[in-house]
Amino acid sequence: MTAHSLRLDHLVISARTLDEGTQYVADTLGVAPAGGGAHPLMRTHNRLLNLWGGVYLEVIAIDPQAAEPADGASPRARLFALDDPATQARLEKGPYLSHWVARVERPKQLGAWQTQYPQRIAPIVPMTRGDFTWSLSVPDDGAFPAWQGAGDGVLPTLIQWDTPKHPSAVLDETGIALKALKAVHPQADVIAAQLHWLGAAHLIALESTDGAAALVAEFETPEGLRTLK
């Protein structure tokens, strides 16, 4: 277990298109995500919604305008399992809360931590979007993080921002706050062990299920309690 507790950075809504994902969030929370931009390396793009306390919500989708690698090389797999046929089949039914991202705060160095524990933490990828740069743990095949074969979006991706400025600091206030992040997983004991090791167990309420893995986020909004799943 790490001695450094992680912080919740953001939640991830996956969608076939940004418009579909934006509409899903707006219909549920009463405010539409905006801003964001493109991730050239991953060939994805996003929109963001500010939440209380330095946390935000990300809607992410494959960017149909993304350029292929200039050197003719094969593009790398997209993050958050967006290239996975199972994910794409699910997105045909609509956007959903697919994942969450936990922040590694300095002085701890995400890259050094991953080098020390490569079986526990996926390879670190440098990312950019506009003026923001950061490091992100992304398996080479673009899958969700996993431990002993269990993941399914319930284990967090790890992020470390390169500058003190965080995206939430430049997003409009919404009056929306995350109340609780919950998950169910058929291998909850394996998931719990990895969350404990990461120092992230305090960020999510985990229960066992005989069914499929799933995430649920509860929000306090000006119109009352709302849920994304």
Regions found by a protein language model. Name each.
Residues E20-P85:
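Glycine/small-residue-rich interface belts in oligomeric ring/scaffold proteins
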